């Protein structure tokens, strides 16, 4: 599919006023984000399209339903009966808000998660087709949680577009086209800057932010900017304290749907991502990837200013503030500003009456005066500790002691399993993994291991 053949109707969705009232605030925010961003994606690619009415309404903060279109549907109506029959409406359903396809497939198309259903559920036998090929909601009588979940997953939305490769069906032709690219490998959207290609418009637009650095959405509370409106909305919850995503098991609430999803794995004990190096299990793939870097030593995030590399993107972001004069975190007491939020928190302890020592150069705060003196050397470049062997100088005495081992050959760190010695504790820690990884059971049952354990205890 060429870029010119994509229209806003392919990636848009309409809600009636009746449907809109069932959506929770977080779902309405998600809808606004997706609609405005998808329109922005098409415009940024130079497609000649006029601004739809629904986009204008959303930009003005108005309700998005269009015209006076009447939709005669009795959504999720329930017949009361004896026994444990509960009210059944969208507010009882826990949706997986972690994906934007929640809105793009009309809320129900991904299948709701019925984790909160405890008793029987009874719905009226009735079927009505929605207008404009937008779906089908079928109501049947069911008496068990699994039966209802299975029925709703199959029947809630009409999916007339089927993939010939795998049989998967979709409610929209455009969704089928996007899916088929997973089989063909087609990537029709190319970046004009670097030539990298993508299968979806949204991925291209996200990638182009790397080249432009454009972050048009600004937080009014702290002036922090974001590439996407959805990121700004999530960030604003750090100021308001809003936590719209609640765990049905324990009642704990979260500001992000992804955090709720991660938390819910605690209740089911699901850790399907296992590290092949050490066997440690993780609840999410991102946690596994972050962990694996500790084995490889890889530092994929590089600062374009000085070339310094980092294991985590958050560490790179924190480092980059060194190169800029931007200090977004301001103290309400004295109006002093800081690069990092953690620096502001430490600084505020001074106003609380704690005796802390603050660096005049960068504002960093220390609990001990000696730590401040040591830190100031990083600004002055002073290195008072010199090696008598090679005249190499260091800012810390401990760094000199470590360096001198390269001359003396001292190796104070000894492995309790094989008696191999090392100059650095970090090298010993790395070495000890070879015992636990190669044969963990033999290591745990060995005499040296138990003597080491006894000594440690």
Curated annotation (Swiss-Prot):
- Fetch the SUPFAM superfamilies from UniProt: beta-beta-alpha zinc fingers, KRAB domain (Kruppel-associated box)
Q: Which InterPro entries match?
A: KRAB (IPR001909), KRAB_dom_sf (IPR036051), Snail/Krueppel_Znf (IPR050527), Znf_C2H2_sf (IPR036236), Znf_C2H2_type (IPR013087)
Q: Which Gene3D superfamilies match?
A: 6.10.140.140, Classic Zinc Finger (3.30.160.60)
Gene Ontology molecular functions: DNA-binding transcription factor activity, RNA polymerase II-specific; DNA-binding transcription repressor activity, RNA polymerase II-specific; RNA polymerase II cis-regulatory region sequence-specific DNA binding; sequence-specific DNA binding; sequence-specific double-stranded DNA binding; zinc ion binding
Task: Cite the residue ranges of zinc fingers (C2H2-type).
Answer: 161-183, 189-211, 217-239, 245-267, 273-295, 301-323, 329-351, 357-379, 385-407, 413-435
* UniProt keyword list: DNA-binding, Metal-binding, Nucleus, Repeat, Repressor, Transcription, Transcription regulation, Zinc, Zinc-finger
The domain of life for this entry's organism is: Eukaryota
Q: Which GO terms describe its biological process?
A: negative regulation of transcription by RNA polymerase II; regulation of transcription by RNA polymerase II
- Tissues expressing the protein: Seems ubiquitous. Seen in the heart, brain, placenta, lung, liver, skeletal muscle, kidney and pancreas.
| Domain KRAB: from-to ranges | 6-77
- Location(s) in or outside the cell: Nucleus
Q: Identify the coding gene.
A: ZNF140
Pfam family name, one: zf-C2H2_6
Family in the record: Belongs to the krueppel C2H2-type zinc-finger protein family.
Q: What is this protein called?
A: Zinc finger protein 140
GO cellular component terms, A-Z:
nucleus
Briefly state the protein's biological role.
May be involved in transcriptional regulation as a repressor.
* Broad class of the protein's primary localization: nucleus
For this protein, the record's PROSITE patterns field holds: KRAB, ZINC_FINGER_C2H2_1, ZINC_FINGER_C2H2_2
